[in-house]
Amino acid sequence: MIRMPFEKPATSPATPSQWLADSGGHYALSALVGFLFACTGPVAIILATGARGGLSESDISSWIFGAFFLNGFFTIALSLIYRQPLVLFWSIPGAVLVGPALTHLSYAEVIGAFLATGVLMLVLGLSGWVRRAMDAIPMPIVMAMVAGVFLRFGVDLVRAFREQLWIALPMTLVFVLLTAAPRIGRALPPLVGSLAVGALAVWQLGVFKPPVGALFGIAHPNLYMPQFSWAAMFELVVPLAITVLVVQNGQGIAILRANGHQPPVNAITAACGIGAIVTGLVGTVSTCLTGPVNALISATGEKQRQYTAAVMVALLGIGFGLFAPFFTRLMLAMPPAFIATLAGLAMLRVLQTAFVASFRDHSTLGALVCFLVTVADVPIFGIGAAFWGLVFGLLTTRVLERPARTAAASAAAESAQTK
């Protein structure tokens, strides 16, 4: 009999009646705040990525459907089984990686890479080799790749001031004010306030351009036939898997542990693998354990009841995904400067974290090489820059930085012996 390395739940899974009994207004509020974060800036990133990659409105709507509707069910199952806040959505860094890839790969090839990434994560979760995979590449190099692929969103935020000053300026000012006033910001998240003010500015300026035909619509997701190519496998599978396992899941697991939980790493990885396969068929980038949303819902209240907020986030996400065509048409009717500002503001803290993690400690030269190669965005042999950033960054660290680390370790050991 094959024994799966899944972590055993500390208690029996919660039933719907137990979930209702454990729920409360406090957890509903934290779930609402977490959901509002997920459906603002991160959705703007999907829209910006889709526009850059030439995806149709139908493609983007199907992507959002999978990201919220399908991942919502995985969240409910995992959170009820382990009675922990385990919200699964989609990989934001992964979504950003897709944009450049779509300039020279077909959408079918990209979807093939989504499925291959899901299979890889499922194998790692079933085998228990997750930790080994997470330690394979130094964190500074991984975060340098993330900084490289996210940099464009920060630059586009600045450019939005040139294109539509009276949209970008009020959105940014409200974001800064709500961020600087944490008490108000907890009740009204900065991104939500920025979105509301931006929508008001768009309405006042008369630049809202609704599509021809009905604005309202219920989801009719597309089912895509994947195409597997070596170029897409090399370019996307390794970077996608690394961003999910190290950047997203690693962050989410660390946050949950800091808040007193014991997240089941192998089960989460396997669930992300299955989620990536299922959602990939409708065009959604890889499933992951979200860091910010889980941070919001696990920061307050009784630890043993916080799973109820995760289920509420999932239910809100299912509703949002069900009406994905409506929200997609609504957002695409906004001017590009609105999307660029919202996405850029959502990426500010992520960019800051990525730069700090890249250049704070060891492997900084490798991180710099990785960052430069990724930002240059020059494909080699038809394979995108993010993959080569990891390759050249890792080679730089192995060849040029290992002797320095060894010498530093030896000097420290000798110093300790003489004391």
List the predicted regions and their residue ranges.
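Membrane helical hairpin/interfacial module
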Residues: 58-60, 66-67, 74-130
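Transmembrane helix boundary and interhelical junction motifs in multipass membrane proteins
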Residues: 41-45, 87-95, 249-250, 284-294, ...
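Interfacial segments of multi-pass membrane proteins
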Residues: 97-103, 178-179, 293-309, 313, ...
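Membrane-embedded helical hairpins/re-entrant loop segments and their flanking transmembrane helices
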Residues: 3-25, 48-74, 238-307
